[in-house]
A protein has these predicted regions:
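Well-ordered beta-strand positions
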Residues: 28-31, 60, 120-121
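A long amphipathic alpha-helix within ATP-dependent nucleotide-binding catalytic cores
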Residues: 98-101, 105, 110, 154-156, ...
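A hydrophobic, small-residue-rich beta->alpha segment in the mid-to-C-terminal subdomain
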Residues: 115-163
Length: 201
């Protein structure tokens, strides 16, 4: 692990692109260079994975505008009583879930809005799985996602894939830099990062 550099507290607001303000937040976070870690708690309807609690830590890479997390929950129960399985419920360690984001960085305050496209990146040799390109296309078609934001998002998404997942031209047996080394120091910080804020759904 690289030597610890000075870190800065940061407040994070989270939502989907086009959501009205205020978004969910402010969430306690810590900045380390181009990476930010922040946390929030899930409600009791979410059952945590073995050895985990309902406190979800998420990382932002501000250079490419993506958020990544290993989901802390095993399954959730809806208000109607239906069971929703989490990511990789049959695996000891879930794949990382990576979201394309629109990030507004104001220094001590960061606004992160979900831009629909996701990829699941396992660390056990399984292949990646790209998700929700249809939702991205629907948002453009419906007028909810302006063309300039869509173009910028796709360019940043390709840069994320090329930098962190598959840097070489041809496929390799391992990811280029995933989980990113940039989050190592943040991942080692004890929880909670600050006052716990619970997501109410």
């Amino acid at each position: 692990m690289e030597p610890m550099e000075p870190m800065e507290p940061v407040a994070v607001w989270q939502g989907r692109y086009g959501d009205p303000v205020p978004l969910f937040g402010p969430l306690p976070g810590v900045r380390d260079g181009r990476a930010i870690a922040y946390e929030y708690a899930l409600p009791e309807s979410f059952e945590p994975r073995p050895g985990r609690n309902r406190l979800q830590r998420t990382f932002l890479l501000t250079d490419v505008g993506v958020a990544l997390a290993q989901p802390c929950w095993h399954r959730a129960t809806t208000g109607a009583g239906d069971i929703v399985p989490g990511v990789d419920p049959g695996q000891d360690e879930p794949a990382w879930y990576v979201d394309l984001m629109h990030v507004t960085d104001r220094g001590h305050e960061v606004v992160a809005r979900d831009l629909y496209i996701d990829v699941m990146v396992p660390t056990d040799g399984r292949h990646q799985r790209l998700l929700d390109l249809d939702e991205f296309a629907d948002a453009i078609e419906d007028g909810g996602l302006p063309a300039d934001a869509a173009v910028d998002g796709l360019r940043r998404w390709q840069r994320f894939l090329d930098t962190y997942v598959h840097r070489d031209r041809d496929p390799r047996a391992a990811w280029s830099d995933f989980p990113p080394k940039a989050i190592e120091n943040l991942a080692a910080l004890p929880s909670p990062l600050g006052p716990v804020v619970t997501w109410e759904g």
